[in-house]
Amino acid sequence: MSENALLALQRHFEDQFGHIEGLQPVSAKPSETAFNSDASEKEQSPTTSNEEEDAISDMEDKEDVSFGSKILRVSHQEVEKPTLSATVGRVSFLKKMPKLEDEEEILAKKREEQKLRKRSRQNDDGSDDDEVENLKNDLELQKLLRESHLLHEATSRTGQVQLVAEGKIRHKVVQQHIAQLGGKKETEKMPMAARRGMKKKQKHIEKVIENEARESGTVLAKKRKERKQFKKGFRPVTFSAPGKLVGGTLLLPKSMIPK
């Protein structure tokens, strides 16, 4: 209900039952004057009938019964919105801004970076030196393992422990190293008769082994056939063409020339 209706209801109630203590009057607004003027005009106008007045009074009685002696009032007050102070925004803006550094702070940071770089370089140099030394030790150990059988032979003869190859042993070590690198194996210096005897003995041993394997039924590895080597400039007799033709002249070996 509007305030004008409440004011009219309060007046009607006071006319019938009198004023009640503790009941606060309803404040009238400028629209109340218009309502009063309309009500006075309606009372003065002869068109209003008694039936309409009775109906209005019945409605007002019902409203009195429903509301009782309490009148509800609603006050509308404009609530001011809190405005943010400029200092809060300024502080948040300054927090987001990067911190300005002085020249002294910049120089201190540069010095710290230089110190860290020097330390890292020293550590790298130390690790490189260790790697070089370890590699050198590995090579020496490998060399000692390769020469161990020759050094053991020398120590067994002399009775003194030798870790460095000397004399004939050093020559053997060099030849062994050349053979490992893919070089041709040099034949040892000895008389031709002794060499032929060694080869003959080796062939005899191989034949004995083959005969024993054939009798026992064991299978040996297939032997590689050696090609016969001929001297340069001569051909074997099996070829159809005798000798060699060079520059229009026929060269014959001495074995083919009749005596």
UniProtKB/Swiss-Prot annotation:
The keyword Phosphoprotein applies. It comes from Schizosaccharomyces pombe (strain 972 / ATCC 24843) (Fission yeast). Keywords: Phosphoprotein. The modification Phosphoserine is found at residue 127. It holds the Pfam family FSAF1. The keyword Phosphoprotein applies. GO terms for cellular component: cytoplasm; nucleolus; nucleus. It comes from the Eukaryota. Residues 22-68, 111-133, 181-202 are annotated as: Disordered. GO terms for biological process: maturation of SSU-rRNA from tricistronic rRNA transcript (SSU-rRNA, 5.8S rRNA, LSU-rRNA). This is Uncharacterized protein C3F10.08c. Residues 50-63 have a biased composition (Acidic residues).
